[in-house]
Curated annotation (Swiss-Prot):
It catalyses: iminosuccinate + dihydroxyacetone phosphate = quinolinate + phosphate + 2 H2O + H(+). Binds 1 [4Fe-4S] cluster per subunit. InterPro entries: NadA, NadA_sf, Quinolinate_synth_A_type1. It comes from Pseudomonas paraeruginosa (strain DSM 24068 / PA7) (Pseudomonas aeruginosa (strain PA7)). Iminosuccinate binds at H48, S69, Y140, A141, N142, S157, H227, P228, E229, T244. Belongs to the quinolinate synthase family. Type 1 subfamily. This is Quinolinate synthase. One of its GO terms (molecular function) is 4 iron, 4 sulfur cluster binding. It comes from the Bacteria.
């Protein structure tokens, strides 16, 4: 997908899919109705840290999960509910369905996609892989089910470095897709032989080093937290680099009282919940309005609203289906990731 067509697509979503603002009473009524439907349908709501705060709060209040994509996958896989409602973007719903083919997986909207997914079409990616058959194919979770089915491993940003180190120790050269910035970060961290696909996240690519330096001058005592999907020049300014869950832990453990945060502002809900005495400031992006494709908030994550969540439960709309022919091939690299991270957890527990 070209930069121009991607920009037009995102702006179309921003223009046409702006959610209706609910009154306080309407919001409370929707939350109560969603909670009742979840209970009646033996359903659980899982929400990503980048969703709007009202959705994250509802997931917590109803016994669901608010987490990064790795823990969303793990939670949906282990929870006994027969229906999983995934508030996030489409690849997260697909992942839940691949890992739980016997469960019903709903999403508030099927239009909530991801620029990384859009930028890695399976036909082009498969041809790229075929040109480099000697390489182990490692793909980021932010990809379609079809791309996952072409991979040897799936990773999230919270486990990517460890898995690539494991493969490097085995002497395996790697073909990486789709996020070029995360790929370069992993490459620098591990020294691995990695061939990178040319993709990027529209949210993180807009963070700018020069403006970040200027903001740091305004908050000289602030720590800078950066997601590794950001450009290298932004990562270089960070006091802590990591996945969403890792950045939240950094906010809890670093002694600073102020943080400049270079990731989607949806994460502020959990940071402020866990660190109410601390101040969190959005890192600067390319600007506002037409010049800014995301302005530190994913337009597709913003499509997960209370109204759409209630509608998907009442109407059964937004159900995720994955081609059964893809499932056995897509589940294999996902299970490898889950098994690897579970083993790593056990090793850490044993060393505690």
């Amino acid at each position: 997908m070209t930069q121009i067509s991607e920009r037009l697509l995102v702006q179309a979503h921003l223009a046409a899919k702006q959610p209706r603002v609910l009154s306080e009473q309407e919001s409370a009524e929707h939350r109560a109705a969603i909670a009742a439907e979840l209970k009646a349908q033996n359903a659980v709501l899982v929400a990503h840290y980048y969703c709007d705060p009202v959705i994250q709060a509802l997931a917590e209040e109803t016994g669901g999960c608010v987490s990064d994509s790795l823990e969303m996958a793990r939670f949906g896989n282990q929870h006994p509910a027969q229906t999983v409602v995934v508030a996030g973007v489409r690849f997260m719903g697909e992942t839940a369905k691949i890992l739980n083919p016997e469960k019903r997986v709903l999403m508030p909207t099927l239009e909530a996609t991801c620029s990384l997914d859009l930028g890695c079409p399976v036909d082009e990616f498969s041809a790229f892989c075929d040109q480099h058959p000697e390489r182990t194919v490692v793909v980021y979770a932010n990809t379609s089910a079809a791309v996952k089915a072409r991979a040897d491993w799936v990773v999230t940003s919270s486990c990517a470095v460890e898995i690539v180190e494991h493969l490097m120790d085995n002497g395996e050269p790697i073909l990486w897709a789709p996020d070029q910035h995360l790929g370069r970060y992993i490459q620098r961290a591990t020294g691995a032989d990695m061939l990178l696909w040319d993709g990027a996240c529209i949210v993180h690519e807009e963070f700018k080093a020069k403006q970040l330096e200027d903001m740091k001058a305004l908050y000289p005592d602030a720590a800078i937290l950066v997601h590794p999907e950001s450009p290298e020049s932004v990562v270089a300014l960070a006091n802590a680099v990591g996945s969403t869950s890792q950045l939240i832990r950094a906010a809890q453990t670093l002694p600073n009282s102020t943080f400049i945060v270079a990731t989607d502002r949806g994460i502020f809900y959990k940071m402020q919940q866990l660190c109410p005495e601390k101040t969190f400031v959005e890192a600067p992006t390319a600007g506002n309005g037409a010049a800014c494709r995301s302005c530190a908030h994913c337009p597709w994550m913003a499509m997960n609203t209370l109204e759409r969540t209630l509608a998907c439960l009442r109407e059964g709309s937004g159900e995720i289906f994955v081609d059964p022919a893809l499932v056995p091939r897509a589940v294999r690299p996902l299970k490898r990731m889950l098994d690897f991270t579970q083993a790593a957890r056990l090793r850490l527990a044993g060393n505690a």
